[in-house]
Amino acid sequence: MFTLLVDFADKISVFNVFRYITFRTGGALITSALIVFIFGPTIINSLRLRQGKGQPIRADGPQTHFKKAGTPTMGGLMILSGIIGSSLLWANLSSIYVWVVLLVTLGFGSIGFYDDYLKVTKQSHLGFSGKARLGLEFIIAGIAAWVIMHNGQAPFSSSLTFPFAKEFIINLGWFFIPFSCFVIVGAGNAVNLTDGLDGLAIVPIMIAAASFGVIAYLSGNAVFAEYLQIHFVPGTGELAVVLGAVIGAGLGFLWFNAPPAAIFMGDTGSLAMGGLIGTVAVATKHEIVLVIVGGLFVVEILSVIIQVGYFKMTGKRVFLMAPIHHHFEKLGWTESQVVIRFWIIAVILALVGLSTLKLR
């Protein structure tokens, strides 16, 4: 639609607004939200009929979770429909970065869908083989990293910059590809582990999307990039449109995921969203900033790594339960307290992350 409407700009001046990324980002946000609002109830009813018992609830989880039994999962299908449909309408599809991000999103979403399918059919929280799942994720991430490195649309830089230290730069060289794989796969699984309470993951996802929407817009603009002394990556500005679609789809999904949730995001959505944000961070050359903006996700995945590692070494646990949001539930926090307090942390971390654009 972007190309069609811009063609009219030479004849009808009002169509010039479609040249502006900011306008199209707003359009993508509204469109994706409407897609989820309109088709959401149909998708939820269909999934409820097909899944029967819905997503299985962990037997060792907090007692308050057992009342959620029967809630359908795979709500990520709603989110992906909104993002992809809206992005194809509003984004400039001549940007290779748009295609890379959307394909990673679809790839990770497909892996998550199969994982959800196995969990529902087997009625077990153990789905897809961990090794096979990670292997597929690394293959998809590796292809994305290779395309970003050899896309030919702009001079490529393999340098890694650090917030608050503009003079400290590491040239990754060919290590850029394995490093990017680590970022993308790590982001996907970090968001996946965060998705354990109603509304817990989707709001921080939208916050991260908004933050990286700003970063993508600035990175794709030569004037702003030079002023802020950040990497100028032509074409990444269009990722702001995709991220606008993420926010819109997230708002639509939250309408149905607000407690008591009518549907869960599932791995279909959480893996896809994490992979999307991780790929944007790699494309815009802000991988380290992702650690700050997505700090909540980082803490969640670290809590699992620490819990598993320490238990294997000592037979004891560091946390009452991992990921860490369940630890706080076990301490007596209500679900709403955990969710809202984690949202607040996500907002603070996003503001800190954005501040690094100027404080260099």
From Swiss-Prot:
Biological process annotations from GO: cell division; cell wall organization; peptidoglycan biosynthetic process; regulation of cell shape
- Entry superkingdom: Bacteria
Subcellular location(s) per record: Cell inner membrane
- Cell wall biogenesis/degradation: is it a keyword of this entry? yes
| E.C. no | 2.7.8.13
Task: State which pathway it belongs to.
Answer: Cell wall biogenesis; peptidoglycan biosynthesis
**InterPro entries registered for this protein in UniProt:** Glycosyl_transferase_4, PNAcMuramoyl-5peptid_Trfase, PNAcMuramoyl-5peptid_Trfase_CS
Membrane topology, from the record: Multi-pass membrane protein
Instruction: Spell out the reaction equation it catalyses.
Output: UDP-N-acetyl-alpha-D-muramoyl-L-alanyl-gamma-D-glutamyl-meso-2,6-diaminopimeloyl-D-alanyl-D-alanine + di-trans,octa-cis-undecaprenyl phosphate = di-trans,octa-cis-undecaprenyl diphospho-N-acetyl-alpha-D-muramoyl-L-alanyl-D-glutamyl-meso-2,6-diaminopimeloyl-D-alanyl-D-alanine + UMP
Task: Give the cofactors, semicolon-separated.
Answer: Mg(2+)
The alphabetized UniProt keywords are: Cell cycle, Cell division, Cell inner membrane, Cell membrane, Cell shape, Cell wall biogenesis/degradation, Magnesium, Membrane, Metal-binding, Peptidoglycan synthesis, Transferase, Transmembrane, Transmembrane helix
Give the transmembrane ranges.
27-47, 71-91, 93-113, 134-154, 168-188, 199-219, 239-259, 262-282, 288-308, 337-357
A Gene Ontology CC term for this entry? plasma membrane
The UniProt function text for this chain reads: Catalyzes the initial step of the lipid cycle reactions in the biosynthesis of the cell wall peptidoglycan: transfers peptidoglycan precursor phospho-MurNAc-pentapeptide from UDP-MurNAc-pentapeptide onto the lipid carrier undecaprenyl phosphate, yielding undecaprenyl-pyrophosphoryl-MurNAc-pentapeptide, known as lipid I.
Query: What is the official name of this protein in its record?
Result: Phospho-N-acetylmuramoyl-pentapeptide-transferase
- Species annotation: Mesorhizobium japonicum (strain LMG 29417 / CECT 9101 / MAFF 303099) (Mesorhizobium loti (strain MAFF 303099))
